[in-house]
């Protein structure tokens, strides 16, 4: 019985071939938790839910420092502290001020003083380097798939030619070799047409060489368009939130104003009632005082006339 290996997410056991190479995930976990790019720092991470579009580190920074600003060097929306992202800040401390990237022309490429760190002798920024490596990896995988498929077809045709035997074997062998030779250049020509962009490269190095610069540019432009769309979406969300807050403040102000008016009307009404009561009481007291003074006068006049 073949050995089984556990998925790093669901911990169920599968054959080694059924797990992914990097994360060691099964097919269901790869679909449920795909590897996506963080909206802010642009690093790849395993998405836990479809609504979560930022990595855990950026989520913690958002809670601590609030929404980030675009970095003044690389324009990535990851400047939580100051005007520079953490990657550019650390690179600037380590390698000095940034230079212009030879791919995207932004002032965000740091010279590490080592030609081995450069991409085909070019000084590229972090995003352009990732795009280049991603395109290069895809071409390598396509080349590997092409070579494996050609070997499989060659092996099948050799087995068929062995079974046929005799003169038929020789004729089939010549046909198979000629067909394979015709097939491989056709498939190679597709990749060679992709990689030849005015530069001269050898056929063996065409797929691994930097002739895929235009693909890197296209990938970079797509990433920039996606970044701009996300920035626009975020700004629209910020505008909507601000409009919502303004509406809530207006509603709260109107409510408080109506409450104050009602309170003032109630106080005015109460004051009027108290004033009327005091005036009525004052009139009653005046009547009583007049009656007392009148009775005193009558008593005095009676006392004078009695002798």
Swiss-Prot record:
UniProt entry keywords in alphabetical sequence: Coiled coil
Phylogenetic lineage: Eukaryota, Metazoa, Chordata, Craniata, Vertebrata
Residue stretches in coiled coil: 217-299
Database matches in InterPro entries: FAM76 (IPR032017)
Protein name listed in UniProt: Protein FAM76A
Keyword presence, Coiled coil: yes
Superkingdom to which the source organism belongs: Eukaryota
Gene that encodes it: FAM76A
Gene Ontology CC: nuclear speck; nucleoplasm
Region (Disordered): 142-195, 287-307
Pfam assignment, any one: FAM76
Entry similarity comment: Belongs to the FAM76 family.
Record flagged with keyword Secreted: no
Origin species: Bos taurus (Bovine)
Record's compositionally biased regions (Polar residues): 161-182
């Amino acid at each position: 019985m073949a050995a089984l290996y556990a998925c790093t997410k669901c911990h169920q056991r599968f054959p080694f071939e059924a797990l992914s190479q990097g994360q060691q995930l099964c097919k269901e976990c790869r679909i449920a938790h795909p590897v996506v790019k963080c909206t802010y720092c642009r690093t790849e991470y395993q998405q836990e839910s479809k609504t979560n579009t930022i990595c855990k580190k950026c989520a913690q920074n958002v809670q601590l420092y609030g929404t980030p600003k675009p970095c003044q060097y690389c324009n990535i929306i990851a400047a939580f502290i100051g005007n520079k992202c953490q990657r550019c800040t650390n690179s600037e401390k380590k390698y000095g001020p940034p230079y212009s990237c030879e791919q995207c022309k932004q002032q965000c490429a740091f010279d590490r003083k080592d030609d081995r760190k450069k991409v085909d002798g070019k000084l590229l920024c972090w995003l352009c380097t990732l795009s280049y490596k991603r395109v290069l990896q895809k071409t390598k995988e396509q080349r590997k798939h092409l070579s494996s498929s050609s070997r499989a077809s060659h092996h099948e045709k050799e087995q068929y030619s062995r079974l046929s035997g005799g003169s038929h074997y020789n004729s089939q062998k010549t046909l198979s070799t000629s067909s394979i030779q015709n097939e491989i250049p056709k498939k190679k020509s597709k990749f060679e047409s992709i990689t030849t962009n005015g530069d001269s490269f050898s056929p063996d190095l065409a797929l691994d060489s930097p002739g895929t610069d235009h693909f890197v540019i296209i990938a970079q432009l797509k990433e920039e368009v996606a970044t701009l769309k996300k920035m626009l979406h975020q700004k629209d969300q910020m505008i909507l939130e601000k409009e919502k807050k303004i509406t809530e403040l207006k509603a709260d102000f109107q409510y408080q104003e109506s409450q104050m008016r009602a309170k003032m009307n109630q106080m005015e009404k109460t004051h009027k009632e108290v004033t009327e009561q005091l005036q009525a009481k004052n009139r009653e007291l005046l009547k009583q005082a007049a009656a007392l003074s009148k009775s005193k006068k009558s008593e005095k006049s009676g006392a004078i006339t009695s002798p």
